Structures are given as structure tokens and as C-alpha cells.
Amino acid sequence: MDVLVIGAGAVGLTTAISLAEAGLSVTIRTAEPPEQTTSVAAGAVWGPVKAGGPPDRLLAWGRTGLEVLSALAAEPGTGVRIAAGREVSRAPLEPYYWTKLLPDLRPCEPSELPNGFSGGWHYTAPLVTMPVYLGYLRARFERAGGKLEVSPVDSLTELAGAAPVVVNCSGAAAFGLVPDPAMVPVRGQVVIAANPGIEEFLINRDPEPPWIVYLFPHGDTILLGGTNDEGNWDTEPSPEVAERIVAGCVGIEPRLRGAEILGHRVGLRPWRPEVRLEAEPFGDGVLWHNYGHGGGGISLSWGCAAEIARSVLS
């Protein structure tokens, strides 16, 4: 074994794929299979939201992610498509700095705004159906010769000598695993409902912590959100929170009223002041840290994976 990757969310899987497809022998060790990781609760439209660090570094990683996800949208079975959508607000709204990478960003027309909203931005971007995408990533990793072991890691020190290269993609679990006191979980709860025919995603940018209203259509279903609850480690869905989520989404998209509720998901976004992507000596080998992507893990994962692969292979 050349590389041991810890974690099988989107960040761990893309890192493992980038190394395995380069010809290295890679094993993933994970506390839960991909479909049970935080990644499954992601929306997930491209955009490194709530990711900390220098903007130029985030833009570089995000650009790679945008390119890879856009290419995957042309392939069947990946769970990725190019979707149109809007970010709206009741107050003047500046676009995120990373939207400069989107070629068709434009102000919303008045007819495109929900009732009571005064401004917003319209664009197209990759939209990811996470259960399908995670299955695709796992299959791609295994086709490249990778192995996945469901076995929790209690301490990084137990892995010294396990492989010449160990990559820590443990997400919020890095708080205790490293340990990293700068690691803060940001709890996100979402509701899965039957889609009444909505085609465009919609995000309400009005701040109302810990609430954030968004909806992401995925064919016959639609993902409704959500929460940004900092410091909350609870991974069980709350019926009261779910009720508030649905009400918020109905408030900006009345077609959702009465939609059948199909399920609930909870994930812990791994936030820290700066994404941690760096290497350190580890026994006779090297330990890479690749975690702390906040709400931008799907968007940044391919760029971070490429940076690790370049270094390991050089």
C-alpha cells in the first residue's frame, strides 16, 4: 500500500481517486460508508460557501472543481448536471467573489424574483445529486484498484507506519482525531420532498442564523434546506427543525405547499478559519491534512486532491 486515506466523503474519495488513477496503491479507511457521510446531506450546487482561507487559494481549488464537475455533467451516471438557479435577497445583494468564475452570471429580472424580494443573481452551475455522485466516486475508485475498509480510526498515531503517505480527510471528526480545536461543526439539516415540477435551484441570501432557505431540485425529488448551526454535533433530524425548513421554503416557492415529505438528512459541515491542506512528517513517511472545507467540500475537493497528487507524485 502506497497511500492510506482517512475518510470516505467527497473530499476523501476524490483524493483517493486522484492518487489511485495515477497508479498508486490506495486504501480508504472510514468510520462509515460514503452514503452515510456528511457529504450525502449536501445540496449540492458548485460554490465554496463558508470555506475559510485566502480567496486566491480557494479560487484556484474552486476553478478545478468547476471544470471537473462540468465535465462530469456530460457523462451519464455521475449524478452531476448543469442547472440554472437564483440567489435572492430582500436587500441589495453582492455576488460572492467566486462567482467571477461563472460566465453567465447576471442580475435577476424583476419577474424572476419571489414576492417581497428586491434583488438577486441568476447563473448556471454544476448541481450534484449526492447519493448518485458518491456511488459513482466509490465505483470509480474501486475500478482504479482502490480498496475501501469500513473501520473507525481512534487516533492518527495508530496509523504511523501504515503507509508511506497518509491523508487525513476526516472532516469534522478532525476535531478529536488530530486533535484540532479550530475545527467547528456547522450542523445542516435538510428535507427531501417530492418535486412538484420545480426546475431551477433557489437560495435566499438574507441572513437569519442559524436558518438558511434553499431548494435544489433533483429530478422527481427536491432538497429543502436548511440550517447553519455552529457548534452543534447532533446528527439526528429534528421534527421541529424540519417543519421550519419546509415552511421557509414554501414561503419563497408556494408550489411546495403540500409536497410529500420523503426523508430527512443531517450533516456536520467541517468549518475552520482556514481550510487545512498541508503536509507534515509522520514517522518515516508523510501525513497530509485535507479537511475544514466548511460548506465548500464538493466544490473544492477536486482542486485540493490535485494539489496533493502533484506533491506526492513529484
Regions found by a protein language model. Name each.
Residues 2-27:
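N-terminal Rossmann-like FAD-binding beta1-loop-alpha1 element of flavoenzymes
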Residues 14, 160-247, 252-260:
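Flavin-dependent oxidoreductases
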Residues 21-40:
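Glycine-rich FAD pyrophosphate-binding loop
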Residues 44-118:
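Dinucleotide-binding Rossmann-like beta1-alpha1 core, especially the glycine-rich loop
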Residues 53-64, 120-136, 236-241, 299-300:
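Short beta-strand to alpha-helix junction loop
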Residues 80-84, 148-149, 254-266:
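A short coil-to-beta-strand element that immediately follows conserved catalytic motifs
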Residues 117, 121-154, 160-163, 169:
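Helical element adjacent to the flavin cofactor pocket in flavoenzyme catalytic cores
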Residues 136, 259-314:
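C-terminal catalytic lobe of FAD-dependent flavoproteins
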